Amino acid sequence: MPVEPAEGEHPMLELRNLSVGADNEGVHRDILKNVNLRVDDGRLLVLTGPNGGGKSTLAKTIAGILRPDTGRILLDGEDITERGITERARMGIGFAFQQPVRFKGLTVRDVLTLAAGGQVSEDKLYDYLRDVGLCARDYVDREIGSSLSGGEIKRIEIATVIARGARLTIFDE
C-alpha cells in the first residue's frame, strides 16, 4: 500500500489528469488519456508496456519535450506544465533518449564536463565512467563518434546524466 505524503508535503513528481494526443491526417488520436501518477522522492519507477503504448510520449511530456493537451505536471508541488525543457532541466529533470546523440568532435571528457556545468576533477570524471561500467582510462579522452558502439554511447549518456546531478532522471529505453 503506497504511503501518502504528510500534510503540507508533496510528492516529487505528480501528474494530474494528463492527456496527450497527436493529429494524423486531420484525425486527433489520444496517446495518453487522464494519466494520474505520484512519485515520491528517492523512489525508482519503471513503466513497461507494448510498443506504441505511450511510454516515450509520457517520458517526453514530463521532460518538457512535448506539451500535454490537458492536465498538470507538478514538481515538488509546483506546477511546471507550461515550462519548457530548458527550464525543467534547470529545475533538476534529466532525460536520456532512446537513441543517444553522438557528439562528433567532442571527447567523453568534454561532454561530461559540459553535463557537470563546469570544471570537473579527473577523479570525478573517472567516477562517472566507473559508475556506468566503463574503464575510465580507456574512454575519458576518446572522441564520441562512429568508433563507439551503441552500448558504449548509451553508457556515456548515462554518465552525463549522473554528472548533471539531476533530481529526477527519465530514461526512455
Positions of predicted regions on the chain:
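ABC ATPase C-loop
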Residues: 161-162
